[in-house]
Amino acid sequence: MYLYARKIIAWTLADTMEVSTVIETINKAKACRNTDLPLIIHSDRVNQYVSNAWREATEKMQQSYSHSGYPYDNACIESFHSLIKREWLNRFHIINYKHAYRLVFEYIETFYNTVRIHSHCDYMSPNDFEKLF
């Protein structure tokens, strides 16, 4: 999530939380945000985010970690996870990976980033808010 605009800039759907899945998402985010500006990456302290592969993939970024057992440090993404479940996924009986992928894609790419307003973004969508800057 690009915190300033509350925009999901990269995501990966997997049935496990392996380091390779996390690295794939980081690589997507890097490709999306091709910039030389200093970047801060925030995560919690689970194994995937403290591994050597993670450190290598994010070596040019400033690392920021949540305190152990304190999800409020990562409240924006925790809120997003709650929203996608409550507003969208809980409405469906997901039958397989392909169906789940389509649902997540629809929510993020055709609603959350493009239509859903956020008070933080002056009641604009993340895409519209980001265009201002």
Where are these regions (language model features)?
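Charged DNA-binding/catalytic regions of mobile-element recombinases
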Residues: 1-133
